[in-house]
Amino acid sequence: MGQKINPIGLRLGINRTWDSRWFAGKNEYGKLLHEDVKIREILHKELKQAAVARIVIERPHKKCRVTIHSARPGVVIGKKGADIDKLRKKVADITSSDVVINIVEIRKPELDATLVAESIAQQLERRVAFRRAMKRAVQSAMRLGAEGIRINCSGRLGGAEIARMEWYREGRVPLHTLRADIDYGVATAFTTFGTCGVKVWIFKGEILEHDPMAQDKRMAESDGGGSSRPRRDAA
């Protein structure tokens, strides 16, 4: 089953935690869940060029704290913070809570599975040879310290008449090992021949302690190998 299931969902509560971190009663839960979906849709639409990997939503008392993990924080903030103010207003229109937006910079986008998948998808849309795009992504990830990476591309690759799936793997990607820190990302390339799917698994080592927040702490604490700066409140 480890081969088929989403590796992030499999590890929730073990060494990964949820991207929506709040509790609500029966009457409020559905409403807040729909708000989360709308907030993510709007932010991904507005920040297409900002290389956004994750959006974490927390709801302390009468507040909505949105943390955007981006490889290009300058694009999110905009000139003198103008763009982030617009984003805050758009999010505030969806939710009745006070909105606070934080931005976390991803220092090594080559080690973030979502950003790697989106990068390959964009290259496929620009008609870059799919094998070259995949090999380049594999080499970059391994050079920057990944212990293993696997990339799947499927669809009418290179404009072929019959759709197929091709994959590359380097190093170890132990999908069955629950203590493995595996990042997973998907993206879709809309080419002139049809859609192509891209899936990326990146193995970053093992997390031995049983702590749902272990992966976030590891990202924040590791100096050279970490993928995030300390949080910066943009409110």
Swiss-Prot record:
GO biological process, one term: translation
Pfam families referenced in this protein's UniProt entry, alphabetically: KH_2, Ribosomal_S3_C
Residue span(s) of domain KH type-2: 39-107
InterPro entries given in the database record: KH_dom, KH_dom-like_a/b, KH_dom_type_2, KH_sf_prok-type, Ribosomal_S3_C_sf, Ribosomal_uS3_bac-typ, Ribosomal_uS3_C, Ribosomal_uS3_CS
GO MF annotations in UniProt: mRNA binding; rRNA binding; structural constituent of ribosome
Top-level taxon in the UniProt lineage: Bacteria
Disordered: annotated segments: 215-235
Keywords: Ribonucleoprotein, Ribosomal protein, RNA-binding, rRNA-binding
GO cellular component entries: cytosolic small ribosomal subunit
SUPFAM superfamilies reported for this sequence: Prokaryotic type KH domain (KH-domain type II), Ribosomal protein S3 C-terminal domain
Task performed by this protein: Binds the lower part of the 30S subunit head. Binds mRNA in the 70S ribosome, positioning it for translation.
Family membership noted in the UniProt record: Belongs to the universal ribosomal protein uS3 family.
HAMAP family: Ribosomal_uS3_B (MF_01309_B)
Record note on quaternary structure: Part of the 30S ribosomal subunit. Forms a tight complex with proteins S10 and S14.
Name of this protein: Small ribosomal subunit protein uS3
Protein species of origin: Rhodopseudomonas palustris (strain TIE-1)
